[in-house]
Amino acid sequence: MIYKNSDFLKVIKMSTVTLKPDGLYIDDKRFDMLSGDIHYFRIYPGGLRRRLEYAKAFGLNTIQTYCPWNLHEPKKGEFNFSGMLDLKGFLELADEMGFKVLLRPSPYICSEWDFGGLPAWLQHEEMVVRSSDERYFTHARDYTKRICKEFVPYLATNGGPIIAVAVENEYGGYGYDKKYMNDLADVLRECGVDVPLYTTDGYFCDMFERGCIDGGWVGVNYRNESSIAINALRKFQPDKPAFVGEFWSGRAVHWCENFKRRDINEVAAGFKEGLEEGAYMNFYMFAGGTNFGFMNGANFGVTFNAPEGTPTRYIPMLTAYNCDPLLNEEGLPTPKYFACRKALYEFLGKDEPPMPEIDYKSQEVAPISLKKRVSLWDAADYGAAVKSKLPLNMDEMHQDYGYCLYKSVLTGDGKEKVLDLPELRDRADIYLDRKFVATVMRERDHQPIALNLEKGKEYVLELLVENMGRINFGEKIVEKKGLVTPPTLDGEVIENWECLSLPMTEISSLEYKDAADQTGPIFARGQFTAEPNSDTFLDMRDFGKGIAFVNGFNLGRYWSLGPQYTLYVPGELIKESNTVEVFEQYAIPADGKLKTSNCSIYNEE
């Protein structure tokens, strides 16, 4: 086979890939696979090579990655495989650097990613996702066929680096629809996937059985209990090599909880124990990356180390996918990297080789003056709003991400009224005549929102509602966003709304002006000079809540409640002259300055 690499044309020998009880064989030679997750879609273009260099220096020979359906097909039938979504480029770079690839292209990925990687437009129709429901499976089949065109030429059997392909993700912890799983596998095979197909699940109850496909390779996911998990896997599947699909080297972190790292020595010991058990080990994650834009997911549960009895609720993930991995968000080795590398070479009975020199630069930029500003109230074009007797949710407006602004007019009767937002998804700032009243977060206890409305006087009620990320795992994964049911005033439904979609995709085209007003909700813009190809971090500790852009690229959400206080700006995004834009929901700092840092800042335990 011949395919075009970014640097050269390359002719490659086709291989065979087979599974035996003692290992995975490539061309009848046992392959001692050691792998880790690095997700191309979480890393700004140009940043992959450094992370792969550190992976090679560690001792990895294989990279595992998901493929996010929601980014590759943002609208039905419209596909994107460019920029950060250049799957072919990732596969060619991995091959150039000597890595094999475990590819996980199936429709659902979880991965603390919005809607688990499913496209939001699926929720515009009635269907049962992750099932053999034909209304869902038709879309899943179409996507699978399309993405196969991207990666099938890169299978090992076609001379490429891909040695195995995953079917779905941790399905044993979600459903039990064998037809769905086997039909997905059949689509892959029909598209020419002739390397081993695999699934990965936890080892509790009957997860292996519920999540596997007929004749497939089963892997196990777990935190640290290597011997227990691997022995459970071998008991279920004695005829194939033991494969740890996800050795959880860290943990996902939500907003409003402290960033607590896992014990380094425990992780290194668990990793070494898995090697001693003779299993193929895969770090999840090896390099974390970033949930740029609005791509962070959410859970429905409790935060880490929550007191017993804490009620379950919606908890969104951070922008940074800095889930305490071996390489941090900016792609640099952590103490855990070196501890696990030491454990690897102790297992191999070899001296650790010296670390190679790998170029990296970061910078702190002079405080950025945000002189140009425009209030949301001036920018909001209610002429584009949809008028409706009852408020429309985001899905009814065919809006997938961002904010919505809802407006209605209330007439006072001289009595105090209580405003309630019964099904809010996910967070709302409440304004009366454009004066801030309160913030409401879904499933959180809050004081009744009392409104004192003078008799006969009209008031404009406006609700700025934010979709903070779709749930990525569990039974509550399907849900509408925005105002799902109408707000009430003393139990009576409020009617006659103007519903304005604010996807936050065009903020660079706003009419910014020199202004002193710092009160939110407000857009602000500034210019800064910096050294290209040198990382920096926006220090958002003086701000409240919102999103930030550099050179038109959405870096993601910030929130003063932490534990993440900085937004990562990849050096590859930075030019000599740069523009930063911020949407701040509450207030710009009094001095109008945005600071930066040369490293990330967290509230850590």
Where are these regions (language model features)?
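Substrate-binding/catalytic cleft of secreted carbohydrate-active enzymes
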Residues: L103, P107-F283
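Carbohydrate-binding surfaces of carbohydrate-active enzymes
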Residues: E125, F137-A166, D177-K178, A185, ...
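Short hydrophobic beta-strand segments in globular cytosolic domains
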Residues: F31, V437-A438, L555-G556
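Aromatic-lined ligand-binding clefts that engage carbohydrates, nucleic acids, or primary amines
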Residues: E416-Y431, L461, F528-N551, Y558-W559, ...
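Aromatic-lined substrate-binding rim segments of carbohydrate-active enzymes
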Residues: L48-D114, A185-E190
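Aromatic- and acidic-residue-enriched carbohydrate-binding clefts of CAZyme catalytic domains
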Residues: K29, Y66-L71, K75-E78, G83, ...
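Aromatic- and glycine-enriched glycan-recognition loops and surfaces
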Residues: Y40-A57, K76-D95, K417-L419, E423, ...
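N-terminal carbohydrate-binding accessory modules
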Residues: K4, F8-T62, E92
